Amino acid sequence: MAKSMNFSPRTIEASELLGTQIRIGRLERRWTVEELAERVGVSVVTLRKIERGDPSVGLGVAFEAATLTGVPLFYEERARLLAELRHARDRLAVLPSRARKAGEVDDAF
């Protein structure tokens, strides 16, 4: 049995916004739920979860539905998205490869 997640209100609201935008894009293109589900490569049930804003749906699947329906992800221009991705990768490269718990500070002297 899958573990139940407790999502923060902001996550729930953002998921609902993305799902609503995807539904608007689908309706503007006059695609049925079945048509978009086929284009995304998921079941109708999964697509309905996306449109309802279910935060448990896979991120890549939701992003693909958004891309196909014209919902902008981060930046309209692909060049800007790629530039931001390069910047994020550069920042990540200078950080430690993993986080370690900070040791206790002994300040009793």
For each feature predicted by the language model, list its residue ranges.
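Short basic helix-loop element that most often maps to the first helix and adjoining turn
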Residues: T20-E35, E64, V94-R100
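Short alpha-helical DNA-recognition segment
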Residues: R30-R48
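Short, charged recognition helix plus adjacent turn
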Residues: E76-F109
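Short amphipathic alpha-helix starts
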Residues: S15, V40, F74-E76
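A short, Lys/Arg-rich alpha-helix, primarily the initiator
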Residues: A2-E28
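DNA major-groove recognition helix of helix-turn-helix/homeodomain DNA-binding modules
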Residues: G58-E76
